[in-house]
Swiss-Prot record:
Single GO biological process annotation from the record: L-arginine biosynthetic process
Keyword Lyase appears in the UniProt entry: no
Official protein name in the record: Arginine biosynthesis bifunctional protein ArgJ
One GO cellular component term noted in the UniProt record for this chain: cytoplasm
A GO molecular-function descriptor: L-glutamate N-acetyltransferase activity
The entry's keywords: Acyltransferase, Amino-acid biosynthesis, Arginine biosynthesis, Autocatalytic cleavage, Cytoplasm, Multifunctional enzyme, Transferase
Sites annotated Cleavage: 192-193
Gene name of the record: argJ
Catalytic activity: N(2)-acetyl-L-ornithine + L-glutamate = N-acetyl-L-glutamate + L-ornithine; L-glutamate + acetyl-CoA = N-acetyl-L-glutamate + CoA + H(+)
EC id: 2.3.1.35, 2.3.1.1
Site (Involved in the stabilization of negative charge on the oxyanion by the formation of the oxyanion hole): 119-120
Subunit (UniProt): Heterotetramer of two alpha and two beta chains.
Alphabetized InterPro entries for the sequence: Arg_biosynth_ArgJ, ArgJ-like_dom_sf, ArgJ_beta_C
């Protein structure tokens, strides 16, 4: 049950010159559902990405890293759902490379110019013959305005397709950005079962784009959590086609750099928050804001401790203002020299804990009033510095257990 999340209108998603998207129903895991996405990328585009930090990273992640490092330039993306091709060893790597060879043959490009992605069940062999059989159909229906269908084609336990568009102005000219994401469970920073793809018609040097991708990921996909599990397949990739006719951004000091950085990060945040809003069984969307830390990392450490806590998440599901659980999470977050007498806690505008203890003016009915809302902000002030960090998360419901217990059935 998604929290204040609906599918976007297809005509609200902006086509990006130099990017075509096509899909197919290949029967990877289930029949009669979109499960293959093919993205054609114009020659000369810059492409950059960041990937899961899980040591058991999937075969397609390994191949993507190799192909991006080859310097040949990415010309296509292929995504399958229903099977993660993870925990599959050398045979899985061979199947990922076979997929790239099939796409390359279809499009007349080199296999190293294809970036493969998979999402779904781990530890099962990829049915590569079905995937390859679906590629001609995906190639045949590829077009620039297929963003909504593309979002539908990468869904697993998602209940809503996730896509968004935005614009910015660079050197006086309009620039477009469009993107899709997927994910609902096994979501934790760096990165989780999340796939995110954004395309823009801005003109960006590839090395500069890599820095922009890292910045956007740190402030979006690496700032969300659903259940604290880090997946094997997470990937976030940005394509810059250069078709907008703007000057090439070749350094961080370029006058257009900040505007593109902010637009890209804003769109990535929107896509990442859609994942949390569609968290498996979610009924609440929570913003965890920690301020007054000595560093951003310290603030994030505290925010993640609160956001990952099953006791905190189930309290929010029940609308039970058992808010000592939040203070307990702050206490075990690992800030060893934290002076708890300086910690303050708010739920929206309700001041719950003051100077390390219960605020004398706090009334439990006020806390419960906030916790009954679908969207809640938890604000924690550490009182030891000027740094801040924000993490987005959701609650744990009975449906989370049911969805994951039934996932393979």
């Amino acid at each position: 049950m998604a929290v204040n999340l609906v599918a976007p209108a297809a005509d609200s998603l902006l086509p990006i010159d130099g990017v075509d998207l096509g899909w197919a129903e290949a029967g990877i895991r289930k029949a009669n559902r979109k499960d293959v996405l093919l993205v054609r990328i114009a020659e000369g585009a810059s492409v950059a990405g960041v990937f899961t930090q899980n040591r058991f990273c999937a075969a397609p992640v390994q191949v993507c890293r190799e192909h991006l490092a080859s310097g040949q330039g990415a010309r296509a993306i292929v995504v399958n759902t229903g099977n993660a091709n993870a925990g599959t060893g050398a045979p899985g790597l061979a199947l990922a490379r076979q997929t790239c060879e099939a796409v390359a043959g279809l499009l007349g490009i080199a296999p190293q110019q294809v970036l493969p992605f998979s999402t779904g069940v781990i530890l099962e062999p990829l049915p590569v013959d079905r995937l390859i059989a679906g590629l001609p159909a995906a190639q045949a229906n590829a077009k620039p305005d297929n963003w909504l269908a593309a979002a539908e084609s990468i869904m697993t336990t998602d209940t809503v397709p996730k896509a968004a568009s935005g614009t910015c102005t660079l050197s006086g000219k309009p620039v477009r950005l469009s993107g899709i994401s997927k994910g609902a469970g096994m979501i934790r920073p760096n990165m989780a079962t999340m796939l995110g793809f954004i395309a823009t018609d801005a003109n960006v040097d590839e090395a500069v784009l890599q820095g922009l991708v890292r910045h956007a990921a740190d402030h979006s996909f690496n700032s969300v959590t659903v259940d604290g599990d880090t997946s094997t397949n997470d990937s976030f990739v940005v394509i810059a086609t250069g078709r907008a006719g703007t000057p090439r951004i070749d350094s961080e000091s370029h006058p257009d750099y900040a505007a593109l950085r902010d637009a890209l990060t804003g769109l990535a945040q929107a896509l990442a928050q859609k994942i949390v809003r569609d968290g498996e069984g979610a009924t609440k969307f929570m913003t965890i804001r920690v301020e007054g830390g000595r560093s951003v990392d310290e603030c994030r450490q505290v925010a993640y401790a609160v956001a990952h806590s099953p006791l905190v998440k189930t309290a929010f599901y029940a609308s039970d203002p058992n808010l000592g659980r939040i203070l307990a999470a702050v206490g075990y977050a690992g800030v060893n020299d934290l002076d708890v007498d300086g910690v303050n806690l708010w739920l929206d505008d309700v001041w719950v804990a003051r100077d390390g203890g219960r605020n004398p003016d706090y009334r439990e009915e006020d806390g419960q009033r906030v916790m009954k809302q679908a969207e809640i902000t938890v604000r924690i002030a550490l009182g030891r510095g000027d740094a801040t960090a924000t993490v987005w998360t959701c609650d744990f419901s009975h449906d989370y257990v049911s969805i994951n217990a039934d996932y393979r059935s």
